[in-house]
Amino acid sequence: MTRALLCSGQGRLARNMFDMVKSGPAALPILAAANDLLGADPLALLASADTDTLLENRTSQVLSISRTLCSHAALGLRGPALVAGYSVGEMAAWSIAGLWAPEQALRLTARRAELMDAADGDAGGLGFVRGLDAGQLMRLLDAHDCAIAI
């Protein structure tokens, strides 16, 4: 059987996103690396931080990639036949494919988020739209001087 793994991008964070993997030994080095980057235990951060803090680009991206890497490590798979990532999920995909270690993927993810924030300034933002047809969406984009970039 051929295995494929798709690593999601920065999406909705859930406070229980590590519940299935947090007690497994495979997650410990990944969570430790995330702790070093976030300056806080990821599990404690998810439990106590306010929503704005969790949605900060760097925090959200590091948590998202940590979750993916922990999940893959918990499965104990030796690299799927095919691995792909969407947006920041590419960072996890490259690690899972063997390009770099999970800790390096997290460091690069943090740096990626910092560079994105520096390039963006205060005028930008990212949005998610569901449930509108193309015409409705285009009218909203035009009315608010927005564009689809992904």
For each feature predicted by the language model, list its residue ranges:
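A structure-centric signal for secondary-structure junctions around beta-strands
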Residues: 1-2, 123
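Helix-rich "cap/lid" substructures immediately adjacent to catalytic or cofactor-binding pockets
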Residues: 2-84
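Alpha/beta catalytic cores of group-transfer enzymes, especially the acyltransferase/condensing modules
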Residues: 10-11, 38, 96-150
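Basic, gly/Ser/Thr/Pro-rich low-complexity segments located predominantly at protein N termini
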Residues: 14-16, 44, 90, 94, ...
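A broad detector of short, well-ordered amphipathic alpha-helices
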Residues: 32-33, 66-70, 90, 103, ...
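Broad structural signal for hydrophobic residues in well-ordered alpha-helices, predominantly aliphatic
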Residues: 34, 75, 93, 140-141
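Gly/Ala-rich beta-loop-alpha elbow adjacent to hydrolase catalytic centers
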Residues: 68, 81-89, 93, 101
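Alpha-helix C-terminal capping segments
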Residues: 73-76, 94-100
